[in-house]
Structures are given as structure tokens and as C-alpha cells.
Amino acid sequence: MPELPEVETVRRGLQPVMEGAKIVTAEARRGDLRFPFQPDFVKRLQGQTVRGLGRRAKYLLADLGSGDVLLMHLGMSGSFRVIKPEHEETPGEFHYPRGKDSVHDHVVFHMSSGADIVFNDPRRFGFMKIIGRGEIETEPHLKDLGPEPLGNEFDAAMLARACAGKKTSLKAALLDQRVVAGLGNIYVCEALFRAHLSPRRLAATLATRKGEPTDHAKRLVEAIHTVLNEAIRAGGSSLRDHRQTTGELGYFQHSFQVYDREGEPCRTDGCEGVVKRFVQNGRSTFWCPKCQR
């Protein structure tokens, strides 16, 4: 499933062709994706200017001139591509390049610029939903989300408060979207490695008895910032080989320090450890037992 860097890459890829442009017409080529489309889905989009394209955690939000907001989620296999008027196709860069077959093109936005924006989703775990601008805070998919990890409010003190007293593992706490929004398995493994913290460590150890952030919390927040920013600059992570027609995006997997590197040497200078894998809460965890404590 796409994590924050992949969704942010999508947003940046779509922003130039969506923001300020009008959705002349929209097509929903089937009745549902993960959820059924609203009966008036196409009608509410037709003729609307996209005032802005934002992101909240792993969701995209298109702010429409009508006061509505188009909420979009990529699911497991969703991707956008932009077909320009001169028929040059460019990706709205989420890099699991499955499903370019047009049979999986389920939604198309025909923009006033002449470009078409196509949503392709072979597994149909993605969804689109129109809500009122005033409903964002109460929308079930958004209302319980924690702070953005790249936002100003996310710091060591905030993370310590969120984890104080928690008896769950540090990795499980970071994957809890109520604690921090947008992190997933890949970037949690990578951030914990860079902070030299064990995924098995109790989340409560990020806070002192008085609730103040420990050095562990400070290192972890810095590592989260670093990993996410590096991944965004690389266009996210692609776990399958592919090439994009507009350049090399989605190559952060070449910078993985532990993820998907089971049995390989640890990349920490001076560490003679080996990357291990174990299953934690139903997900693969990759770490170096020697330098992550």
C-alpha cells in the first residue's frame, strides 16, 4: 500500500495539471471501487474548478470551486496518469506500475487544459468520495488521524506525549495512524534503523516518567523527517522494476538500509551485524539486532 512519500509524489505529479483547471467532464466507468460511487458523483464534479490539491496522510483532497472536496485513496494498486493534449502520457507518479491495461482505467477527468487524468486500479481497493468542505473534520477516514510527520506540530515532545504509558511496541505505535499519520511498514523500518532503535522496544520509553521526550524520541523524530524527505525527493519506493516515460522516479528502494534486506550485512559503519526479518503484528519487520536497541 502507498505510504506518505508515494502519495505526496502523486500529489506533486498531478498538481500542475489539476490546480486552477476545470473538470469539464468526468467518467466513472464502473459502479464501484472499494466502495460504490455516490449516485451524483459525476454530476458534482462536472464544471468544477480545482482550487487546490492537498494531501492528508495517505489521502488526496481536491478542493473544488463548489465548496465540495474530492477525497481520493490509491488503495493497493491505484495509480494516476496524465494524458496531455499532444497524447504524451506522463505518470502522476505512484510507482507500483501494475495495471496500465485500459480495462482497469476506472475514472477519467477531462480537464479544461485538454489533458485527461486517468485513475487505474486493477485490484479496486482505492476509492473516491465527494464530501463538503465543512465535513473534513468529521469524515470517518480522516477524523481520527494523528499529526502529519512533516508538519510543524510533529516533534519529539508530541511523540513522547502520544507514546507515554503505551505498552505496545515502538513499531506498532508508529504504524498507528492515530499517533502519526501516513507512516507505513517501509518507512517505519527505515526510520527505526536510522534512529538505532529496536522495533520491539516499548513505545513508552520515548517519554520520561514526567512525560518529557527522551533522547530516543528526539533521534526518532529526526530519523522520520530524514527518511520521508529523502523518499519524496526520490519519488517514493517502487518494489518492481519499471521505467517512467518522463524520468527516473520511484527509486528510494535503492536507498533501503534494512527493508527487504534480510540476510545482508548491516550498513552502519563498524557494525558487523546482519539484517534480520521477523513477523510483527502480521507484517514483516526488518532490523539489525546488533545496532538497534
UniProtKB/Swiss-Prot annotation:
A zinc finger (FPG-type) spans 257-293. The keyword Nucleotide-binding does not apply. InterPro entries: DNA_glyclase/AP_lyase_DNA-bd, Formamido-pyr_DNA_Glyclase, FPG_cat, MutM-like_N-ter, Ribosomal_uS13-like_H2TH, Znf_DNA_glyclase/AP_lyase, Znf_FPG/IleRS. Binds 1 zinc ion per subunit. CDD domains: EcFpg-like_N. One of its GO terms (molecular function) is class I DNA-(apurinic or apyrimidinic site) endonuclease activity. Keywords: DNA damage, DNA repair, DNA-binding, Glycosidase, Hydrolase, Lyase, Metal-binding, Multifunctional enzyme, Zinc, Zinc-finger. It catalyses: Hydrolysis of DNA containing ring-opened 7-methylguanine residues, releasing 2,6-diamino-4-hydroxy-5-(N-methyl)formamidopyrimidine; 2'-deoxyribonucleotide-(2'-deoxyribose 5'-phosphate)-2'-deoxyribonucleotide-DNA = a 3'-end 2'-deoxyribonucleotide-(2,3-dehydro-2,3-deoxyribose 5'-phosphate)-DNA + a 5'-end 5'-phospho-2'-deoxyribonucleoside-DNA + H(+). It holds the Pfam family H2TH. DNA binds at residues 104, 123, 166. Its EC number is 3.2.2.23, 4.2.99.18. Its cofactor is Zn(2+). SUPFAM superfamilies: Glucocorticoid receptor-like (DNA-binding domain), N-terminal domain of MutM-like DNA repair proteins, S13-like H2TH domain. The active site is at 2 (schiff-base intermediate with dna), 3 (proton donor), 58 (proton donor), 283 (proton donor). Belongs to the FPG family. PANTHER family: FORMAMIDOPYRIMIDINE-DNA GLYCOSYLASE (PTHR22993:SF9). This is Formamidopyrimidine-DNA glycosylase. It comes from Bradyrhizobium sp. (strain ORS 278). The lineage of its organism: Bacteria, Pseudomonadati, Pseudomonadota, Alphaproteobacteria, Hyphomicrobiales.
